[in-house]
């Protein structure tokens, strides 16, 4: 396959599936199996940087608010308002989520060789069930004020989201709603907690960058990143709209359809 077409497909799939609750890693594995398209480490780094840039741009005002309140807290030059305290709690929550996500992610990384194609399809079904359950407006716990417990549960779920076929955004939003957070807040927690995880992952992969074979030139790499960025902006807006309008069951239907089609083809 021509490299230009390959990077366009990879950029499209990464941009769309990183934010929609359909598992980007699961879809990239499907590309590898059926279209013989693999994801070199250097390209993986560029694509993930492009998608995290989408989150930063989309939540730029919210991120600026959090940065300013953190600086205000460090300098202690003025009294903290109730809103400031709420923002500080969100920062603490994201830090706790990141810590437990890293622990689970490291554990899962050690066993990634055991992930079979059938397991990925099973995980697609698990994700579809979680998305369907979100539409029931479940609220089993009311622990949203317990920052540590909330960070623990969401962090574990986000770590599990590293498994191919499990949607990171889907499982973290499910966990947040389970804890009693609103849909809007759950979405915010899910996407903001993605930022430190992606940057941490890019940092760990940086050394591997110089050990990998460069099969794409700089133009092709940048082209793929641009496509990932453009479609990422589209998909994050679409996901926000569909979550607010209780339309996530569409993604459940999509994932079940993908699994059925794959079983038919295989």
Curated annotation (Swiss-Prot):
Note: Bacitracin is thought to be involved in the inhibition of peptidoglycan synthesis by sequestering undecaprenyl diphosphate, thereby reducing the pool of lipid carrier available.
Topological relation to the membrane, as annotated: Multi-pass membrane protein
Keyword Glycoprotein: no
Lineage of the species this protein comes from: Bacteria, Pseudomonadati, Spirochaetota, Spirochaetia, Spirochaetales
Keyword entries, A-Z: Antibiotic resistance, Cell inner membrane, Cell membrane, Cell shape, Cell wall biogenesis/degradation, Hydrolase, Membrane, Peptidoglycan synthesis, Transmembrane, Transmembrane helix
Catalytic activity, as annotated: di-trans,octa-cis-undecaprenyl diphosphate + H2O = di-trans,octa-cis-undecaprenyl phosphate + phosphate + H(+)
Family the entry assigns: Belongs to the UppP family.
Transmembrane spans: 4-24, 39-59, 88-108, 114-134, 147-167, 186-206, 214-234, 246-266
Any one of the GO BP annotations: cell wall organization
Gene Ontology CC annotations of this record: plasma membrane
One Pfam family cited in the UniProt record for this chain: BacA
Signal peptide: none
Protein name listed in UniProt: Undecaprenyl-diphosphatase
Subcellular location: Cell inner membrane
